[in-house]
Amino acid sequence: GQLLKNRHYLSHLGKRLALYSVVTDSMSCYKLSLNDELVNVDFGEIVSAVRQIKTGYTGHIDNLFRASNYLVSPLNNPSRFIQGEYFLTQAQEQVKKSVLSGVDSVFLSAYFHITGKPGTGKTLLLYDIAKTLSKNGKTVIIHCGKLSPGQYKIRNEIDNLNIVSVSELRDESFSLSDYTYILVDESHRIYTEQFDAICDSVNKNDQICIFSSDPEQVLSASETRNDIVAKIEALHLDGQFTLSEKIRTNRELHSFIMCMKDLNHRPKVPMDYSNVVLNYANTTQEAQYLLAYYRSKGFKFINYTKSNYAPSPFSAYAEDFDTHHVIGQEFDKVVMLLDSSFFYDEDGKLQGIPHPNPNYLYPNLFYQGVTRVREELALIVVNAPELFEKIASIVTPAES
């Protein structure tokens, strides 16, 4: 298994690969064949292969491995997900094993809960578990946002696996009782009545329910008030698991986002923020020009979800996605806007003015958008010099 993973990771380098394994207890030597079979070889072959290497690699090895080559998002890479062209991390594998073991050991209704911060791989893990469970019974994933084309492709091509938006629970044509397994992604976003409807069905029909959540990713005031995560944890859970290691965002971007949320945050080691570009626009028109430039370079513009009833400062910008459309998705390059709707309070925390829809919270919408990025982040600050100055102090810290 490990050699197969090594081949997967190294194949992106475009080099000829020779993959060996040595069992030190017995000094048995194996080579992974092109047919993915282990073949016995003698130790001399490995020595000979090593001697044929004329020059080693002296650069920074991390530069050879871009996250976008390895991280599969079911929503953004549905074909690779359907074909199984991905690996779970050790942490994901362990949680999956524990969940499936728990599912196997219960005969009546049961609840499981997976938590983790953005970028820890909750969505891929939940979809992978759903794909496995669908081989054993009808399975539905409830998505707490708007469905993407990738989700339609998955539900059309994987037998016994349906994906629905949480809003479809009200439809007369949809019945939760049809399913053996119910999985809820981003469950911290659902309303109390939706949560109650899911639990009622699970209890009445002896179903298995798996919730996935991140309490830090609430987008609205009502989501904060509902506190669905507390309601989940108050259930008689058959298993609760946490994903802690971040796999989507590289560590520099993660550090920058943490510093943006709180100016007092200090990374443990010096960080190179060269994959963050900060721009200033004096006017909306200048911002539009910058957006056009970044889009031409392959960046996805994530705008803030708008109110249905009142204009917002960001209504003038036509987005690729809004912050509710990107729930669960990820992109190599992201560009976002900030203006005087944002400010830092006296404690150095990023705050926002009231959104035209009082249910939405600007800092939370920003966090939802900015945590979708994998490789490069561009920020455009529009006519807000104080905000720009504070963010610039993160990108180019003063010499101590």
What does each of the following model-derived ranges do?
Residues 40-94, 102-105:
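Long, charge-rich alpha-helical interaction segments
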